[in-house]
Amino acid sequence: MEKRGWSGNTRKHDMKTLSAILNRAIKTKEYSGNSYPFGKDGFCISALEEETRKRYLSQEYLDKLMNTVFANKPREVARRLFLFSYFCYGMSFIDMAYLKRDNIKSEGGGKYLVYKRHKTEHSKNARFIRIPLTNELCLLLQWFRDNTLLVSDYLLPFVSKDYVGEKLYNHLRSRLGRYNERLREIGEELCFQEKLTSYVSRHSMAMTLQSSGVPREMIGQVMGHKDLSTTNTYLDSFGAVSYT
């Protein structure tokens, strides 16, 4: 990867995706884990991280994205996936890709998306994240059911075949690349100042919550941070942010 000129953060993201898929394969007994490359004594994924500016959308650009419907279907699918991530408090690509019908739970008279982040689901303190199924999310899910091909019980059109293991990893990696390419095209068409990527939805929601006065403890909970210090570090890093 490094020889191909990929950045540390790109390599980190790919390694995290691979780790999540292997962890899932171990959980479903499709992989023994004997040659697991990560963990306590394995490869340190975090060592690949490089400091970058965190780009987020201003409310003006968020409104522009929400109110623009594209005739080009791949772009419209990508736009709605970005908004789904945003309304799910910046849910990551890998967590969205694995969402299935059984992640929808009825609790206390309401419906919720309930899941664990793949990034931390095997850690000791991993906890479930509960996201209320708002009207915006219900409408998006209905649109995907009506306008895209969904495989098995998946809620979103990322997985197009019942792949497992390495095939699933390669498949999702390819899908992420296409998703980000469509987002780049959207950003250019809407005249955003910088490149639109899947990460921008998470950063945008973080700034929306913070600017609305939501306590950092609550922001950390809905974003799946392991502790308050993680949330503080994340939010404080927006000091030198650029508006897309």
Residue ranges, per PLM feature:
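Short, charged phosphate-coordinating catalytic segments
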Residues: 23-33, 85-109
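Conserved small/polar residues in nucleotide/adenosyl-binding loops
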Residues: 243-244
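Short, polar N-cap/turn motifs at the start of nucleic acid-interacting alpha helices
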Residues: 103-111, 192-194, 214-233
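Active-site/catalytic core of tyrosine-dependent DNA strand-transfer enzymes
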Residues: 62, 134-193
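Short, basic (Lys/Arg/His-rich) helix/loop patches that form interaction surfaces
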Residues: 171, 180-221
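Conserved tyrosine-mediated DNA breakage-rejoining catalytic core shared by Y-recombinases
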Residues: 40-41, 98-143
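Basic, Lys/Arg- and aromatic-enriched nucleic-acid-binding interface segment
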Residues: 8, 12, 37-93, 97
